[in-house]
Amino acid sequence: MSANNIIICGSLVVLLSLGGSSEYGRAQETSVPSVEHTATGIPYLSGGIGLDEQDALRAVSDDYNLHVTFALREGNYLSDVHVAIQNVNGATILETVSQGPWLFTKLPPGKYTVSVDSQGKAQQRTTQVPTEGHAEVYFYW
């Protein structure tokens, strides 16, 4: 084995051994969104920036029965969208600011109004959350 091959192999061993403790490894670990609970106890996930977050959200999407997506009409995803979800009685049961283009939440089956605001441009949709499966709501600006 030549000296160059030994150096290259040694470098690879060092890089591979650092994988779990490197800044890159820590950045990947923290990029996966975690479940949050509101004061009313409604669980939700928000994120979807980057492939790691999208993969993580897709992996657990079946656990959530309302999926909301925020995007520009040109196709670019949006984050930092103010979201409020009201039940049929008009009570706000979830209010948050999205951390990415996707917001997944777990609600009791029923009819809901989803109100959103991105940079002062508000929209609203009504949806029916099913007993089984999930509802999808899309907002485009």
Residue ranges and their predicted role:
Residues M1-G10:
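Bacterial N-terminal signal peptides that target proteins for export
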Residues L16-Y24:
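C-terminal segment of classical bacterial N-terminal signal peptides
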Residues Y24-V81, K121-W141:
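Primarily secretory-pathway and cell-envelope proteins
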Residues I93-S98, V129:
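Short beta-strand segments within Ig-like beta-sandwich modules, predominantly Fibronectin type-III
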Residues G110-V116:
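A short tyrosine-centered beta-strand micro-motif
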